[in-house]
């Protein structure tokens, strides 16, 4: 029996020895085989080639976007075949105001004189001197005018093409920055190309450049995209010193520039600062970097405060309060042995301070700093979230604006049709679950690995991923309330979704949860990170590329003959010193096309201008001719322009027409239960004044009309007929 056992065991032992012997032989052979000398150089060359190809792809993507915008703009407006007046009419509303100041700077006899006229402007709005540089953030127009004259471009290109070219160039930089951000997060420039594809396909929801070129956001968001790209690189682990310094420098310059070109930039940066604060709480090892970024915020705020002529809105901004509270907590930070009960109590106390100190600091600052700039924003938010009810015309008019309403179902349908929304939700869920898993691992006291490899499958441990997930959730939550914010959120949806489907680490995280046995998870993750974006790209190419080509080949026409005729009449017939009154949007076009003084402008950061707008809009209410005359003469208006589109507005949403909002504000309709109806014995002014009977003809004389506009001269001498 023993012998049998011996014979049965012996073959197994020999087999084991043979196997171990062969492994040792292979290992010895590998050790003795000299490593090829060119391997490190080859790896360096491969990495260098990858970076060069990725950078070229990023730049080419940006340039292609610029060429596409230029071609589409030409096809839509026939810009090269238009006269100067017809070109300028394409700048509607507040966009017209910005471009008009660019023209004024080019006409100024000197740079100093031009800046002085901007900062002490009394030729735009009657009876009012404004600092246009501060109120409208006109640094882009100032710099564009300087570049146009300094480079000698006036001999080569028309001013309007130079201006549009700069904005289109910034849009190319915008796309390039999104490309780089997605590349940095995923490690492959394939993600950048998918980001650009989704951005272009969903451009109705990613940018407003096609509708209004001079908008502040079209100047500002490209710098914000550069700032986010720099921040993404700065937050990455194992970054060498030179790369970290470069990212920090780019972060500083882009943050400051972003703050200077858009008056609402500090609100966007506040959301980013909250995201970084949560990152600091979630990922302790990034605390020093978060502190450095906060230093950039505070430097940009104070430098912006000085260069924006001591703009009080920056001092009372929530961003400054949050940054100040964070730095104060860091100075008072107590040390406790990690993991002890005392350390946990200290952490809870610090979190409490970070929640309460910003509010306290903001209230203290507002006690000493006059801050009319933010009052209308707070009132609007109160009404928006149902905390208050109001009959105020301005607030209700703002609430009726499409950009300040909740997104429509069409928005979600478009994102789903391009496959963007489903993949974004998938990536977001995986990242959130991984972050939750990592959080509970740390709460349970498990040690964190210094370097996370692909095989670990922990996408939620990377600080830049944590930041982006938190940031996109905050932006997305607000975009669900106000559609205008989708133009900030949707580009980052494109970037995050593209990063996810192209990231082997994200697929590895998912596969480790599924615990597949048939295929090696790492191999499958690498295959999926290349196959899935390729399939998405091919499907997008097949479905949407023909549409993009059709848009470029399809001839469109934008022509507004009535507005052209009105502007021509004003330039030929109206006195140079005349003052015009009408809707703020039309006044912006008049200021640009004619240069004449107006009574109001489409600006919503000045309480006096908001009140002016409401008063001038009374021409569409049920007020007497005498009331309207008193309002117009109080602003020294010489001419009144009634727009038929507003007077006879049908509107899809009842209660949001200008005349409805005026009736609510004036008490001529029932707004809510308990209201007393105030009967108006007068008809709607814009209708009655067209009939030409007394007393309207005593106060106003019609001097011009066409299908869309009726121009009335405000009589200086009133003769009443008996």
UniProtKB/Swiss-Prot annotation:
Entry's transmembrane regions: 51-71, 160-177, 183-201, 246-262, 268-284, 291-307, 313-331, 351-369, 420-440, 465-485, 487-507, 521-541
Modified sites of kind N-acetylalanine: 2
Compositional bias of kind Basic and acidic residues: 25-34
Name of the protein this chain belongs to: Probable C-mannosyltransferase DPY19L4
Disordered, as annotated region: 1-34
Gene: Dpy19l4
Topology with respect to the bilayer: Multi-pass membrane protein
Keywords in alphabetical order: Acetylation, Glycosyltransferase, Membrane, Transferase, Transmembrane, Transmembrane helix
Similarity-based family: Belongs to the dpy-19 family.
């Amino acid at each position: 029996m023993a012998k049998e056992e011996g014979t049965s065991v012996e073959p197994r032992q020999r087999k084991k020895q043979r196997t171990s012997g062969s492994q040792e032989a292979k290992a010895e052979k590998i050790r003795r085989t000299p490593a090829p000398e060119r391997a490190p150089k080859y790896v360096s060359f491969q990495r260098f080639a990858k970076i060069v190809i990725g950078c070229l792809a990023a730049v080419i993507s940006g340039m292609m976007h610029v060429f596409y915008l230029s071609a589409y703009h030409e096809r839509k407006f026939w810009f090269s075949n238009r006269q100067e007046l017809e070109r300028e009419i394409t700048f509607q509303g507040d966009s017209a105001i910005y471009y008009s100041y660019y023209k004024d700077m080019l006409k100024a006899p000197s740079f100093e004189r031009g800046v002085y006229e901007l900062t002490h402007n009394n030729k735009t709005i009657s009876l009012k001197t404004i600092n246009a540089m501060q109120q409208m953030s006109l640094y882009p127009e100032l710099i564009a005018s300087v570049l146009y004259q300094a480079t000698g471009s006036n001999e080569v290109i028309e001013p309007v093409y130079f201006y549009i070219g700069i904005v289109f160039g910034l849009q190319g930089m915008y796309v390039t920055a999104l490309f780089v951000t997605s590349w940095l997060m995923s490690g492959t420039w394939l993600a950048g190309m998918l980001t650009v594809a989704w951005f272009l396909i969903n451009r109705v929801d990613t940018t407003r450049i096609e509708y209004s070129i001079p908008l502040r956001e079209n100047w500002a968001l490209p710098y914000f995209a550069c700032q986010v790209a720099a921040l993404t690189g700065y937050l990455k682990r194992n970054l060498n010193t030179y790369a970290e310094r470069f990212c920090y420098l780019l972060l500083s310059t882009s943050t400051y520039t972003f703050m200077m070109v858009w008056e609402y930039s500090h609100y966007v940066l506040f959301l980013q600062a909250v995201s970084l604060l949560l990152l600091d709480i979630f990922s302790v090892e990034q605390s020093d970097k978060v502190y450095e970024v906060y230093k950039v915020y505070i430097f940009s705020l104070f430098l912006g405060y000085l260069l924006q002529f001591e703009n009080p809105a920056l001092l009372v901004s929530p961003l400054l309060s949050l940054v100040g509270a964070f730095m104060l907590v860091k100075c008072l930070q107590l040390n406790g042995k990690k993991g002890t009960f005392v350390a946990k109590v200290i952490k809870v106390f610090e979190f409490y301070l970070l929640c309460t100190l910003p509010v306290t600091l903001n209230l203290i600052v507002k006690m000493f700093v006059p801050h009319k700039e933010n009052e209308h924003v707070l009132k609007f938010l109160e009404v928006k979230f149902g905390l208050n009810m109001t009959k105020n015309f301005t607030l209700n008019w703002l609430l009726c604006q499409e950009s300040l309403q909740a997104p429509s179902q069409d928005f979600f349908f478009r994102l789903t049709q391009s496959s963007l929304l489903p993949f974004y939700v998938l990536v977001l869920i995986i990242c959130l679950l991984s972050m939750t898993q990592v959080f509970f691992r740390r709460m349970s006291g498990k040690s964190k690995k210094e370097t996370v490899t692909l095989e670990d499958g922990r996408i939620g441990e990377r600080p830049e991923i944590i930041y982006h997930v938190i940031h996109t959730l905050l932006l997305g939550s607000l975009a669900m309330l106000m559609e205008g914010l989708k133009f900030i959120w949707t580009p980052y949806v494109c970037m995050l979704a593209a990063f996810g489907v192209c990231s082997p680490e994200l697929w590895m995280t998912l596969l480790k949860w599924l615990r597949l046995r048939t295929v090696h998870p790492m191999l499958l993750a690498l295959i999926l990170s290349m196959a899935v974006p390729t399939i998405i790209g091919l499907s997008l190419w097949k479905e949407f590329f023909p549409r993009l080509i059709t848009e470029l080949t399809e001839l469109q026409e934008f022509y507004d003959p009535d507005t052209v005729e009105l502007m021509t009449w004003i330039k030929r017939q109206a006195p140079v010193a005349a003052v015009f009154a009408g809707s703020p949007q039309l006044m912006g076009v008049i200021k640009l096309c004619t240069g004449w003084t107006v009574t109001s402008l489409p600006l919503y950061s000045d309480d006096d201008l908001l009140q002016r707008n409401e008063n001038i809009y009374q021409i569409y209410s049920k007020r007497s001719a005498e009331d309207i005359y008193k309002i117009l003469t109080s602003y020294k208006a010489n001419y009144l322009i009634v727009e038929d589109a507003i007077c006879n507005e049908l509107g899809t949403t009842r209660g949001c027409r200008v005349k409805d909002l005026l009736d609510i504000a004036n008490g001529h309709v029932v707004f809510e239960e308990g209201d007393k109806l105030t009967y108006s014995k007068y008809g709607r002014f814009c209708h009655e004044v067209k009939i030409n009977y007394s007393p309207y003809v005593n106060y106003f004389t019609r001097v011009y009309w066409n299908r869309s506009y009726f121009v009335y001269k405000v009589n200086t001498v009133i003769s009443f007929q008996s």
